[in-house]
Amino acid sequence: MRRTVFNEDHEAFRETLRAFIEAEVVPVYDEWFAAGQAPRDFYHKLGELGIFGINVPEEFGGAGLDTHKFEAVLYEETARAGVQFGGSGVHVLLALPYIKMLATDEQKKRYLPKFVTGEEMWALAMTEPGTGSDLAGMKTTAKLSEDGTHYVLNGAKTFITGGVHADRVIVAARTSAPTAEDRRFGISLFAVDTKSEGYSIGRKLDKLGLKTSDTAELAFVDVKVPAEDLLGEENKGFYYLGHNLASERWGIAFGAYAQAKAAVRFAKSYVQERTVFGKPVASFQNTKFELAACQAEVDAAEAVADRALEALDAGELTPAEAASAKLFCTEVAHRVIDRCLQLHGGYGFMNEYPIARLYADNRVNRIYGGTSEIMKTIIAKDMGL
């Protein structure tokens, strides 16, 4: 089937991005992998390339585009090369939508120019120890001072992608107690400066995959957050978080599809080169059947991911549709990558092969942004069940 989601501008960006990855990332990726994070100055290079400013208004230094298609190209190209851009994904996919939706003009003038250049990297802190998917159960608090000039932030967050390098973190905290009718009431969002006194980074977490993405625990002890860094209105944070989940889940879905596509590419190349019993692994009927089945699943996932992308750009992607896309694409990726690793035999278990890293990187897709079980719950509710 002919693919129609991308135009000449997107393909030109793809060529530029592919050349950048080959020159700036592939030669040093093993060093990043061993270090457990990309170096901080790499994000300045992404800023210079224009990655961070695609969807930022021109008045703040961006390109002023209103599309996720360039992000989609980035997902495909990083997966194709078997690399990750550190924790930069959360900067654009997670943090930027909240800034664009909630920040005042004054806040945008302060935040966005440095966002675009990579001078200030952003992260998002929702998850807490012991809460997981139950965001309404968060314990972190932010109390307004008597003079109304600042909030006092106390609490802890965990699994924060980009938490080591972040210069600002959007922190979800309780500003009021939940009501009897709605336990989701009372949560607010703050753009917290990580240089603030009382803000500390705990452990840099050692993950199964996504090794170049810094992930950390955060702690807040009487952190003074200026009132002008409140994003949106008090007590409406849960609504804001829910509003942007569709775009986040699309990003995970599209990234998972791209990983599955890359896995087939890696496996095809390997079985054509690898010889056993005197002939290429690709010549065996089982190999052909396995890769054919994987390709069919990738084709289906591509159609779902592309359709969700078009709906997202049109402002029409519903929560249930986003959940469906995430569930389908991540489950396809799980099956396809596992089968492609199997075709590598013992070499597929070695981290020097991209399929092994891809296997580990992919596993979290069925967990973060809402587990597969949560996605099924959302879909079932939409069905009236």
Task: List the model feature ranges, each with a label.
Residues 137-139, 195-226:
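Flexible, small-/acidic-enriched active-site or ligand-binding loops
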Residues 88, 130-133, 159-162, 180-181, ...:
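Short Gly/Pro-enriched turn/cap motifs at secondary-structure boundaries
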Residues 131-132, 158-163, 210, 247-251, ...:
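Glycine-rich phosphate/pyrophosphate-binding beta-alpha loops
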Residues 118-126, 172:
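A short, Trp-centered hydrophobic/proline-enriched beta-strand micro-motif
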Residues 149-201:
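A short core secondary-structure module
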Residues 93-102:
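Helix-loop "lid/cap" segments that line or gate small-molecule binding pockets
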Residues 1-81, 85, 102-107, 114-119, ...:
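Alpha-helical interface subdomain recognition
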Residues 218-240:
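Long, acidic (Asp/Glu-rich), low-complexity accessory segments flanking structured domains
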